Amino acid sequence: MLRVLFAGTPEVAVPSLRMLAKDTEHFEVVAVLTRPDAPTGRGRKIMPSPVKMAARELGLDVIECDPADECFLSALKATGAQCAAVVAYGKILRESVLEALPLGWYNLHFSLLPQWRGAAPVQRAIWAGDEVTGCSVFRITAGMDRGPVLGQSTVTIGAHENAGELLDRLAEDGAGLLAASLQALDEGVVNAVDQPAGSYDVAAKITTQDAHMRFDVPAFALDRQIRACTPAPGAWANLHPHGDDANETLHVSKAIPADMTADESPRNLKPGELHVTKHHVWVGTSTDPLELLVVKAAGKREMGAPEWARGAHLAEGAYLD
């Protein structure tokens, strides 16, 4: 039986923790390392991480000491862990920590390494228009996501799937891959493969400014941007409801390139120009219009775009930029 320390923080890490804790034939989760309690939600109430809440539910010990503190190494060694499983923990581990466990630290990364190393692999894959992505389990070394790979699994990206939906699928798929990789490690049959040298796309974190939509691009590019930025940080644009300089923020969480065969589909919209009918809201792009499906105005709840438009009192010439 492999004695495992689990390190993770957000909801996406919980399926892996549960799978390892459930498989008592092969694993003993000796402790859980997670980020400190932090302000959460609109009320900014101090809350434990999803991983910490799951660990409590499972009756597992939680290490409160920060890995950067000197006390951490002694706390780590006291667990008797042989290796560590890491899923979206959110902190860089110093070399002395990586060397403290006899079998090392292993990370579940949500891309097919070496492609999309970095903080936002799922979002970047969608934004780039990738049709296939997946999960990789690799040994953590000094370089960012560059250690030898123990195993990979692939999934097809749905044509209308957003980053949150895809990440949920990868979290479930990756939990099985992580468990299988650690079991192979324990049995001595793992085949770790060095990542090939070369230049690969880096998955930089998507900022709020990155999520600002520009409409002088094709409709398919905006569709990818919206799906990549949903649920966070959320794609947005400046709405000019009266066609003048006055503006407010409009978030868009779902849209599709317009069906140009439909009778109501508009023609010849300028980039950013809005066209509204009873059941549809379109915005012009550099190619075909983009139909807005789900939006959220400032201070309002998320709603269907036609419902929003009925209450927005849009004037002739209203536009987004």
Curated annotation (Swiss-Prot):
Q: Name one Pfam family in it.
A: Formyl_trans_N
Which residues take part in binding (6S)-5,6,7,8-tetrahydrofolate?
111-114
What are the alphabetically sorted keywords of the record? Protein biosynthesis, Transferase
Give the superkingdom in one word: Bacteria
The reaction(s) annotated as catalysed by this protein in its Swiss-Prot or TrEMBL entry are: L-methionyl-tRNA(fMet) + (6R)-10-formyltetrahydrofolate = N-formyl-L-methionyl-tRNA(fMet) + (6S)-5,6,7,8-tetrahydrofolate + H(+)
EC number in record:
2.1.2.9
Please provide, alphabetically and separated by semicolons, the GO molecular function terms listed in this UniProt record: methionyl-tRNA formyltransferase activity
Query: Per its UniProt record, what InterPro entries does this chain match?
Result: Fmt, Formyl_trans_C, Formyl_transf_N, Formyl_transf_N_sf, Formyl_transferase-like_C_sf, Met-tRNA-FMT_C, Met-tRNA-FMT_N
- At the top of the EC hierarchy, this enzyme's class is transferase
Q: Which terms in the GO cellular component ontology are assigned?
A: cytosol
Q: Which CDD domains does the UniProt entry name for this protein?
A: FMT_core_Met-tRNA-FMT_N, Met_tRNA_FMT_C
Q: Which family does it belong to?
A: Belongs to the Fmt family.
Function noted in UniProt: Attaches a formyl group to the free amino group of methionyl-tRNA(fMet). The formyl group appears to play a dual role in the initiator identity of N-formylmethionyl-tRNA by promoting its recognition by IF2 and preventing the misappropriation of this tRNA by the elongation apparatus.
The protein, known as: Methionyl-tRNA formyltransferase
Can you name the source organism?
A: Bifidobacterium animalis subsp. lactis (strain AD011)
